[in-house]
Design a protein with these regions (language model features):
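Membrane-interface helix-loop-helix junctions at transmembrane boundaries of multi-pass membrane enzymes
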Residues: 12-21, 59-74, 182-193, 226-235, ...
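Alpha-helical transmembrane segments of multi-pass inner-membrane proteins
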Residues: 125-151, 163-227, 374
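Long extracytoplasmic/lumenal interhelical loops at the membrane interface
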Residues: 151-161, 274-335
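Hydrophobic transmembrane alpha-helices and their immediate junctions
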Residues: 61-64, 126-129, 189, 314, ...
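Aromatic-anchored transmembrane helix interface
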Residues: 72-84, 93-116, 126, 130-135, ...
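Transmembrane alpha-helices of multi-pass inner-membrane enzymes
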Residues: 28, 52-55, 368-380, 385-422
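A membrane-periplasm/extracellular boundary helix in multi-pass inner-membrane enzymes
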Residues: 204-205, 225-274, 293-298
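N-terminal signal-anchor transmembrane segment
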Residues: 1-63, 79-91, 376-378, 393
Length: 422
């Protein structure tokens, strides 16, 4: 079994835990591989399949008498099948469709493996710590790669691997929120150091979306945590800290150069004069969203076909490799209203179950992932995540939080095939 405690990663070996240890190593390797070798073909596919194979070893080791199929696996399989079938009415048949399909199959493998691994609350706690550890390694790798003189220039997160800094910063935000949960709900004071480190990384990444989430996440978590003593004092304290973070970003020269000026330009773009000279990326993202809306209007029910947003933009507007920067409009333009309803149906189910666990059963873990899911929906107005691997790992962990609180584990969350008993 792999554990991360007091800043030390430990591997405890025993005959009973061999399969579990193999899976936990595969989980960490997969996260690091997707970051460090983002541009290497098929390596992400390999590590995703290894996660599934390792979870199968774990399932066999449990000597389970029933075949269990997680609901979130059925959901994403249905969404993947519908996405693939969109080739029948697609505006263009292109290589991107095959690439998207392969990526989505790997996502199915990864999210299924997580549902197999997480069988009780202790498993969920452990996988959260493994995720935090993985992001810590990624952050340290990036800091070690970038000279100190370059830190304030933004884009922290893209230097080591060439990955999109927005995407990396989003994943680090997830780890920051998990670390804040360990600090605030479980009283593990050392985790506040990780919260601070992750927040600094996000500031230096120049990602406005991740910065918003990294500040709003702890605030929302405290607001929802009505079970805590000194509730109103905690609200005042977290809002004060959030205000100080924003003040620091807007007044410190290095922080302002890294992200403060981008925040200022965004506010100018939203609330003042759009003709004023601001960050050109804001204009382009608004333009791409408008194009996605036009495509949806042309084919509202079925969409233009998986991967066709970029292809149509390339053929019609000669803009290569673009996306809408909005998960809602990306899905609506490519897969129509049917694809949109299939995809977000699981979000709805997860949020409802987490809300029930958080407010009725008083589960702090459910409160954590309810906060994450709410912010994910908000952030997807500026991110495209429906076929991204790492965000779906966190969504799968959030789904796992909906069933581990039950005394009998998966009784209510799984479809059971009893044919093996016959």
């Amino acid at each position: 079994m792999v554990s991360f405690k007091n800043g030390v990663l430990k591997i405890q070996r025993s005959e009973d835990n061999t399969a579990r240890t193999i899976y936990e190593i595969c989980f960490v390797v997969n996260a690091l591989t997707l970051f460090a070798f983002n541009d290497v073909k098929f390596i992400g596919t390999l590590t995703g399949i290894l996660m599934l194979l390792a979870s199968m070893l774990l399932w066999i080791g449990r000597r389970a008498e029933k075949v269990t199929i997680p609901y979130n696996t059925i959901w994403y399989m249905l969404f993947t099948a519908y996405s693939a079938s969109s080739g029948l009415w697609s505006s263009y048949i292109n290589a991107d469709m095959a690439s998207y399909f392969l990526r989505m199959v790997v996502i199915i493998a990864m999210i299924t493996s997580i549902s197999i691994y997480v069988d009780k609350p202790e498993d969920l706690e452990r996988i959260i710590k493994l995720y935090i550890f993985s992001m810590l390694v990624i952050v340290l790798m990036e800091f070690a790669t970038v000279p100190i003189s370059e830190w304030s220039k933004g884009s922290m997160g893209s230097h080591f691997s060439g990955s999109n800094s927005n995407g990396v910063a989003f994943l680090v935000f997830c780890a920051e929120l998990m670390a804040f949960y360990e600090f605030y709900s479980k009283g593990k004071k050392r985790y506040i150091l990780l919260v601070a480190l992750f927040l600094v990384f996000i500031i230096l990444s120049s990602s406005r979306k991740a910065l918003f989430a990294s500040v709003a996440g702890p605030v929302l978590f405290v607001l929802l945590s009505t079970y805590k003593k000194n509730y109103f004092f905690n609200i005042v304290a977290i809002l004060t800290i959030a205000a100080l973070v924003v003040f620091f970003i807007m007044t410190d020269e290095n922080a302002y150069n890294a992200i403060g000026k981008r925040v200022a330009s965004m506010l100018t773009f939203w609330f003042e004069d759009r003709d004023h000279e601001v960050d050109n990326s804001l204009y382009m993202r608004s333009y791409y969203i408008e194009l996605a809306k036009r495509m949806f209007a042309e084919s509202p029910l079925l969409g233009k076909g998986m991967g066709n947003f970029a292809k149509i933009i390339d053929n019609v507007y000669m803009l290569d490799g673009v996306y809408s920067h909005n998960n809602f409009w990306q899905i609506l333009s490519e897969l129509g209203l049917i694809g949109f309803l299939i995809y977000y149906s699981m979000y709805f189910v997860i949020i409802i179950r987490l809300a029930k666990g958080a407010f009725i059963n008083k589960s702090r873990m459910n409160m954590l992932f309810l906060t994450f899911m709410i912010l994910l929906v908000v952030l997807e107005t500026g991110l495209v995540t429906y076929n991204s691997k790492m965000p779906h790992i966190v969504i799968a962990i959030a789904y796992a939080a909906t069933y581990v609180g039950e005394m009998d584990g998966r009784k209510y969350q799984y479809i059971e095939n009893n044919s093996l008993d016959e």
